[in-house]
Amino acid sequence: MNPFQKNESKETLFSPVSIEEVPPRPPSPPKKPSPTICGSNYPLSIAFIVVNEFCERFSYYGMKAVLILYFLYFLHWNEDTSTSIYHAFSSLCYFTPILGAAIADSWLGKFKTIIYLSLVYVLGHVIKSLGALPILGGQVVHTVLSLIGLSLIALGTGGIKPCVAAFGGDQFEEKHAEERTRYFSVFYLSINAGSLISTFITPMLRGDVQCFGEDCYALAFGVPGLLMVIALVVFAMGSKIYNKPPPEGNIVAQVFKCIWFAISNRFKNRSGDIPKRQHWLDWAAEKYPKQLIMDVKALTRVLFLYIPLPMFWALLDQQGSRWTLQAIRMNRNLGFFVLQPDQMQVLNPLLVLIFIPLFDFVIYRLVSKCGINFSSLRKMAVGMILACLAFAVAAAVEIKINEMAPAQPGPQEVFLQVLNLADDEVKVTVVGNENNSLLIESIKSFQKTPHYSKLHLKTKSQDFHFHLKYHNLSLYTEHSVQEKNWYSLVIREDGNSISSMMVKDTESRTTNGMTTVRFVNTLHKDVNISLSTDTSLNVGEDYGVSAYRTVQRGEYPAVHCRTEDKNFSLNLGLLDFGAAYLFVITNNTNQGLQAWKIEDIPANKMSIAWQLPQYALVTAGEVMFSVTGLEFSYSQAPSSMKSVLQAAWLLTIAVGNIIVLVVAQFSGLVQWAEFILFSCLLLVICLIFSIMGYYYVPVKTEDMRGPADKHIPHIQGNMIKLETKKTKL
């Protein structure tokens, strides 16, 4: 039978052997009167619930905003592993609501479930914050604590997700349905507010505050943990005025039992003598009431359309992983503000708040006036296409970033520059092979070659002979180099003559957008340089070369330095994103001690503003896909199945994150190619979904109404009764 066709339930020819009588639910105790807000019809208890939700969402999204960078730079995992664990955590957060709903519906009730799992949530934050302390153990300890903390957080946030909104709805009397609807609007506003504010603030706590000489991940995790403590305390404060309905049974479990019984009963009755039934779910008629079977039939028709949906979430949820990793390799200076890479995620909730009224009141109405039938399924398909375009744009940005990156020497190649620290010009040539024409220009005093020159090696390592001409002197020197490296040949005065030294340079930009610096000291005394309150380095006398140090991007007009008998400061100027600098400390007789600044590797030039189009496209896709998808699903399934639909919707998000995990671990593609892969996969899925939607026959509301059935169990369930609100989950 075509799964898209309407399924009218008919009496079967096979007489049921037995029918299980489902006892009616005992009447609920009357709700005790609750204090109201300023004499209105709004219970005072909802204020505690709304504040709780704001703090909890701040806690979750704030912690998650910095998570990918924590994996990369604190736990020192590679990008693929960091992405995989990030999406494994996200997936777990969307699997655990099923467990939370089952606990609330069948055992503890909503209130106790929220309290107990919030305690688990807080414990997870505490363990996660401890794991981010550099002084607490080594790499293994940090990793173990982090994974335990994240597992508890996933259990806590997922477990309470299906309970909090529904518990708020329980505070209203049935006659105050209008006030309850407005409450849900405020509730969902608190979700978006918590997401928006936390995604902006916690990256600043991480990047703008230093702990133990590093980014302060402990603070970035600790503040969201504190907000979760506040959420728990505020929620518990309202305990005495809450209406706490008892557990009412789990409709999700009932659906699974009905489906399982139908399948098993069908296989038990495979004989050709037994009459066939119109629908495979009709085989549950021996045990389950007719209305429940009709509702499950309607549910399965919608769930069939859910099969392609995880691919969309696979793209959408990469904003916090792959797109953040892309942002760290871009120039984040906007002129009026310097962004942290993980702050770009704030665009999503911000644009959601802008796009929802724009689409509802402008775009959809204009399309309707043009006479175009823009159905829900078509909106979802367009949302998928917009997400495809977003990843195509992300791939183009990635390609441009790679083009701006410094070229790398290949096998049997090195890159070489010459720095002349002598008091007069020097001419340098390479002796004895095809490279002798590369360095033909004289290099003036305190100048360098305009760019790195490529030298070809005969083997993986080679000794090069250099001919130096200085005044009337002609000198020969020899230096050894290794393939695939960058070098600086430093010419310096040596009495009345000159000498040279070969210094190995950094090969590439830092992966985290930090600035790399090192120093050459031409003074006759050691110099101690304080780059920050907790970062200093010593440079040996007489052309000593320091190790590389990474520092935050910014202006450094007065870096404190000292020798054994003198304190002084150096103006290093702007140290920009991703650049590598060499500073030569010299004593100029006219201007005193100075630092000659040499940019070995240029800064990131690609502005982070180029990520705005991909964020705008994917958020527009989210508004068209997610909001419309929920509205469509709820219009096509009976009211008794709303909580089951929400469970299935959350599962599609969980599966989408698993797809990213698998691709990140096993694709082996460069980043721009991976973006193209996701874009193409979703395009194929969009085509399949469009075909499914073309043959889908929408169900009218009256078609889902069946005759009253005394065997229908009165089960409402405690999953969130999602209204068609525009929000994050």
UniProtKB/Swiss-Prot annotation:
Residues 24-33 have a biased composition (Pro residues). Glycans are attached at residues 435, 472, 528, 567, 587. Keywords: Cell membrane, Cytoplasmic vesicle, Glycoprotein, Immunity, Innate immunity, Membrane, Peptide transport, Phosphoprotein, Protein transport, Symport, Transmembrane, Transmembrane helix, Transport. It is found in: Apical cell membrane; Cytoplasmic vesicle, Phagosome membrane; Cell membrane. One of its GO terms (biological process) is protein transport. Optimum pH is 6. Expressed in kidney. Not detected in intestine. Highly expressed in macrophages. Residues 402-611 are annotated as: Extracellular domain (ECD). PROSITE patterns: PTR2_1, PTR2_2. Residues 1-57, 105-113, 161-183, 239-295, 365-380, 633-643, 696-729 are cytoplasmic. It is a multi-pass membrane protein. Belongs to the major facilitator superfamily. Proton-dependent oligopeptide transporter (POT/PTR) (TC 2.A.17) family. The extracellular domain (ECD) region specifically binds trypsin. Interacts (via extracellular domain region) with trypsin. This is Solute carrier family 15 member 2. It comes from Homo sapiens. The gene is SLC15A2.
